[in-house]
Amino acid sequence: MIFISYVHHQLEFLKLLPKKNEPVVILGDLINWIDYRNGDGIAKEVFGLENVQKLINLRKEHRFEERKNLWKNLYSNNPEVIMKNIRDAIENQYEEVFRILKKYHVWFIPGNVDDVEIMNSYTSSTVKNVDGLLIEHQALS
């Protein structure tokens, strides 16, 4: 059994998974909202690197009220378009992740940035949402 925590849309890592006849257990966050090391992720795609860098710096400096206000401002300019762009970026990342994962027996538990509804649209006989379930594992044949 292979355990992965926080995929964060790291496709190059997922492509290195060994093909074994046992489950891959993923503990949350299949998508990358913001990578606090370099600013990559959905927020950068939608709001631009400059805004994401500001958000990262405000977080590092514990200036949470200013950070909250910046988020509000970013969402206030054309909210319908922003929400559509966010949704499209989220769906794109899940599509890329699950394109790789469908080759494996996967048990996933959604993380705090994950969209359970979208994730569940990718479930199949080999890809399962096991959040809140008790799983007893025996070798797959």
Task: Spell out what each predicted region is.
Residues 9-140:
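Core catalytic region of metal-dependent phosphoesterases/phosphodiesterases
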Residues 1-8, 141:
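Active-site-proximal beta-strand elements of phosphoester/diester hydrolases
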